[in-house]
């Protein structure tokens, strides 16, 4: 299956198929001028998939030059970025070459940002190995590292030359990370596809249990939705792409409060953020309270957190993190809220005092 991302001279295809890693040479070989392919991955993914990728590319006469970074969100920093860039320069990577990102969202963000600044821009290919990366971060061209002030505050838009999604790579993913990735699937349904949310309700158990057709359908539906949004608003200059931030304003603040650590995975933060966005929308009279309850219950059934308890004692530190959000404009922070399941909207008239009061009420719950 191929999902096109139509962006003029930056257009590319997202290839989705079980077993695709073994056929990676057919997509990667035409994209690189050298016989050596630089591959950025992390030490966990390398143990499972570096050799299969090496074998797949060897069939086309290509060898790999690996750059292996530590796993986890903590690697999205200046130091690791410098390591990646200097390694790629040491390999002699040129503009006509394609660097491969083999890993989850952290590896994809690091590699994409390195490719964006290397020789003022070289090609890169995404081979996402987590559900979160397959359904969200590998598509759309957002690349970034974290700063002390907050998440994804240093980065660039740099579209990949191709994305290769193999659902079979999820077989080695720890259950917690699989569930965290599923949060982005749910987010896709919540922001614009009520029928897809119904499908998620009926198929979440099968997807998490390893059903390949269910996983492939969830991935393809999510990718197609994101591709359409990116094509309409590539650089988030309007409200269309901003809808993808459903759950992220709350979520990023929670991640920052948790120290960008394994204490709270990104997808878990998004799950809590989506639950909060629907509760807040219901309190403001935008959304039926029944929809907010349904979202919370679905996340619980998926084994995902839906409440910020244990992350912060009061709202004040979360609001402080929100003030560093990259979406801030003239001191105003837009929130993605909802009028119902499948109907997200951007609200630009939300006083932070109202948000703080809401969060304090939520955090006071036992």
Model region roles, listed by residue range:
Residues 85-100, 111-126:
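Non-catalytic interfacial helical region
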Residues 6, 32, 91-94, 117-119, ...:
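Solvent-exposed alpha-helices and their adjacent loops that cap or buttress functional pockets
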Residues 183-185, 286-366:
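C-terminal charged capping/lid subdomain of soluble metabolic enzymes
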Residues 1-98:
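ATP/NTP phosphate-donor binding region
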Residues 113-206:
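A glycine/threonine-rich phosphate-anchoring loop and its flanking beta-alpha core
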Residues 106-113, 134-135, 252-253:
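Short glycine/serine/threonine-rich phosphate/pyrophosphate-binding segments
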Residues 203-316:
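Active-site segments that bind and position negatively charged phosphate/pyrophosphate groups
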């Amino acid at each position: 299956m191929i999902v096109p991302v139509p962006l003029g001279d930056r257009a590319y295809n997202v290839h989705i198929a079980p077993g695709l890693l073994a056929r990676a040479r057919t997509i990667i070989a035409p994209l690189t001028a050298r016989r050596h392919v630089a591959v950025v991955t992390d030490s966990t993914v390398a143990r499972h998939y570096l050799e299969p990728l090496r074998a797949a590319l060897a069939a086309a006469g290509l060898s790999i030059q690996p750059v292996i970074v530590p796993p986890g969100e903590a690697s999205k920093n200046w130091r690791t970025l410098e390591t990646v860039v200097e390694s790629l320069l040491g390999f002699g990577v040129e503009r006509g070459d394609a660097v491969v990102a083999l890993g989850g969202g952290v590896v994809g963000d690091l590699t994409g940002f390195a490719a964006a600044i290397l020789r003022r821009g070289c090609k890169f290919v995404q081979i996402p190995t987590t559900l979160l990366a397959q359904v969200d971060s590998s598509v759309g061209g957002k690349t970034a590292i974290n700063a002390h002030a907050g998440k994804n505050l240093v980065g660039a838009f740099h579209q990949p030359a191709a994305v290769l999604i193999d659902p079979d790579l999820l077989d080695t993913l720890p259950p917690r990370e699989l569930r965290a990735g599923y949060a982005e699937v749910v987010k896709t349904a919540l922001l614009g596809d009520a029928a897809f949310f119904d499908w998620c309700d009926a198929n979440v158990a099968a997807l998490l249990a390893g059903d390949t057709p269910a996983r492939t359908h969830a991935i393809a539906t999510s990718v197609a939705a994101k591709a359409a949004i990116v094509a309409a608003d590539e650089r988030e200059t309007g409200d269309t792409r901003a809808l993808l931030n459903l759950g992220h304003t709350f979520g990023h603040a929670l991640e920052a409060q948790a120290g960008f650590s394994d204490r709270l995975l990104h997808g878990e933060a998004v799950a809590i953020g989506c639950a909060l966005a629907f509760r807040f929308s219901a309190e403001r009279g935008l959304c039926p309270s029944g929809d907010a309850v349904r979202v919370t219950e679905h996340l619980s059934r998926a084994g995902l957190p839906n409440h910020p308890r244990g992350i912060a004692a009061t709202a004040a530190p979360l609001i402080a993190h929100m003030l560093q959000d990259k979406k801030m404009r003239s001191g105003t922070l837009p929130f993605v809220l909802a009028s119902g399941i499948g109907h997200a909207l951007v609200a630009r008239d939300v006083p932070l005092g109202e948000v703080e009061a809401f969060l304090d009420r939520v955090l006071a719950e036992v």
